[in-house]
Structure formats: structure tokens, C-alpha cells
Swiss-Prot record:
CC per GO annotation: extracellular region; synapse
Signal peptide: 1-23
Propeptide: 24-67
Main localisation: secreted
Source organism (scientific name): Homo sapiens
UniProt protein name: Neuropeptide S
Source taxon at top rank: Eukaryota
InterPro entries registered for this protein in UniProt: Neuropeptide_S (IPR028138)
GO biological process, one term: positive regulation of action potential
Cellular localisation: Secreted
Length: 89
């Protein structure tokens, strides 16, 4: 049991640090005129380039969560009924 816990811990740690291995620094010969290695690291990192693609799969789920429920009588739609609308319905 302890070995399976260790294995799970190693698996979780390796998956959580995988983005670090994708962001390897570019050698200075490939970058002309830049000496700041931190900027080179950020420029070579694919996860830093576009965060919208990374979270695109969550967009439909989040949209469904925040859609207000609407009923025929207007409850939940956020609209305020006037006396004419109440008499009409």
C-alpha cells in the first residue's frame, strides 16, 4: 500500500511539473542580441504564448454554469414585470 501511495505521489508531481520541461531555455546562438535568459525562457515557452487555447475546453462548461434559468412567468430571467405584464399573463 505504501508503494502505491509513493507511486501516486510521483505521478502527480511529475504531471504537475511537466510544463516546466516544455519551457526549456533557447541557446544564445539562436537568439540574436538578447542576453536576458529569463526573457529567452519565456519566449520559448509554448504554455506562455496563448492561454486561451489551454482553457478553451472549459468554455462550454463555464457558459452552461452561468446561464440563467428562464421560466414562462419571468422568474429567474432578471426582468422586472410591470403591472401590465402581470395582468396580461
Amino acid at each position: 500500500m505504501i508503494s502505491s501511495v509513493k507511486l501516486n505521489l510521483i505521478l502527480v508531481l511529475s504531471l504537475s511539473t511537466m510544463h516546466v520541461f516544455w519551457c526549456y531555455p533557447v541557446p544564445s546562438s539562436k537568439v540574436s542580441g538578447k542576453s536576458d535568459y529569463f526573457l529567452i525562457l519565456l519566449n520559448s515557452c509554448p504554455t506562455r504564448l496563448d492561454r486561451s487555447k489551454e482553457l478553451a475546453f472549459l468554455k462550454p462548461i463555464l457558459e452552461k454554469m452561468f446561464v440563467k434559468r428562464s421560466f414562462r412567468n419571468g422568474v429567474g430571467t432578471g426582468m422586472k414585470k410591470t403591472s401590465f405584464q402581470r395582468a396580461k399573463s
